[in-house]
Amino acid sequence: MENFPIVDMGKLNTEDRKSTMELIKDACENWGFFECVNHGISIEMMDTVEKLTKEHYKKCMEQRFKEMVATKGLECVQSEIDDLDWESTFFLRHLPVSSISEIPDLDDDYRKVMKEFALKLEELAEELLDLLCENLGLEKGYLKKAFYGSKGPNFGTKVSNYPPCPKPELIKGLRAHTDAGGIILLFQDDKVSGLQLLKDDQWIDVPPMRHSIVINLGDQLEVITNGKYKSVMHRVIAQTDGARMSIASFYNPGDDAVISPASTLLKENETSEVYPKFVFDDYMKLYMGLKFQAKEPRFEAMMKAMSSVKVGPVVSI
């Protein structure tokens, strides 16, 4: 089995830049995932985020989760559950307008560090998008511009905890899916594993690594790259012991951003369009009902809708 791709961002400013860019290229083409180290986010900040996230779960969310489990009788299930996930979550919106001040039960210190963490992740996301542009032969800033709607991109963070599960063979932590959006940056627990991706019809563990950021590509990057890069099915396996923390930040197109394959990435003599052109919010509305199904029917449905939907040009910045 090939080794999971680990990208040392610090090597981009050394004589190893070419090989590092090749590693990113291979990861995007063949994995849809890679893990970043030396990414510019301080160890101290990451440790604080982890500490306060776990404290918040214990203080404000653990009991609610236990009550939900008891209400639904999940500890006694005898057959596979396919309509819910074994996770406790809340969501923070950063762009276009932050919702952090509106989320109840967050301590002031937690709000402050999550705002700072989000700014660092936004910078990293935009740096990575430009690296992808370089590998794809697109002008610098192309992907960021493609994600811009009238109010800029959407950016938010899903904070998840996966408590110990008594029946992991019957209940998934998070069911298999591809991500709808652009580029996803994950700060995951380094002690409790669970995240897996599908590669060559086999489920492969995404290795927990302290202070790393896991990157994966969403459906929108598959469309814009005309399939050169792929979004990949992934899931979270619940564990019988140990609670797993997951902080996933989604740098997505704006609601009214128009998404379509980059013209320079269309193949010569390509007689039929493989990927549709659509407004991102229209895709999200479709995705919400089909998240845990294959992505191809979503693309096909958007393709069929193309003739009846008028979309304008990409917003310039």
From Swiss-Prot:
Its cofactor is Fe cation. Pfam families: 2OG-FeII_Oxy, DIOX_N. Fe cation binds at H177, D179, H234. It comes from the Eukaryota. Residues 153-253 form the Fe2OG dioxygenase domain. Keywords: Ethylene biosynthesis, Fruit ripening, Iron, Metal-binding, Oxidoreductase, Vitamin C. Its EC number is 1.14.17.4. It is an enzyme of class 1 (oxidoreductase). GO terms for molecular function: 1-aminocyclopropane-1-carboxylate oxidase activity; L-ascorbic acid binding; metal ion binding. Disulfide bonds: none annotated. Pathway: Alkene biosynthesis; ethylene biosynthesis via S-adenosyl-L-methionine; ethylene from S-adenosyl-L-methionine: step 2/2. It catalyses: 1-aminocyclopropane-1-carboxylate + L-ascorbate + O2 = ethene + L-dehydroascorbate + hydrogen cyanide + CO2 + 2 H2O. InterPro entries: DIOX_N, IPNS-like_FE2OG_OXY, IPNS-like_sf, Oxoglu/Fe-dep_dioxygenase_dom, Plant_2OG-oxidoreductases. One of its GO terms (biological process) is fruit ripening. Signal peptide: none annotated. Belongs to the iron/ascorbate-dependent oxidoreductase family. This is 1-aminocyclopropane-1-carboxylate oxidase.
